[in-house]
Amino acid sequence: MALTTFARFHARPGQERAVRVAILEAIVPAREEPGCLGIQAYHSIRDSLLFYIHSRWKDEAAFEIHAELPHTVRFLARVTPLIDHPLDVARTEQIG
């Protein structure tokens, strides 16, 4: 069953550009992963500090592989000091 994830990143004030760049650079190699069905990045219109990554994976195993790949590990190490809340990743299944 396909897995859809929503990752929420709340940038520290003044780190918006760095978070944006890190996210945009991270989604490029993720799109090439065999289990990735699609991945997009979003920036909130109402809160300039808030970013999202929406992704779809072939299944949960594909997402687990993604989470362990070097480019994902590097991205998390890069973005973690730039955000002021713990990273929130919701794993969901489509219901309609």
What is the predicted role of each segment?
Residues 1-3, 18, 34-36:
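Short, flexible segments with low predicted structural confidence
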Residues 2-9, 40-67, 88:
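Short, well-ordered beta-strand segments in beta-rich or mixed alpha/beta enzyme
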Residues 11-16:
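Short, surface-exposed ligand-recognition loops at beta-strand->loop->(often short) alpha-helix junctions
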Residues 91-96:
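Short hydrophobic/aromatic patches at helix-to-coil boundaries
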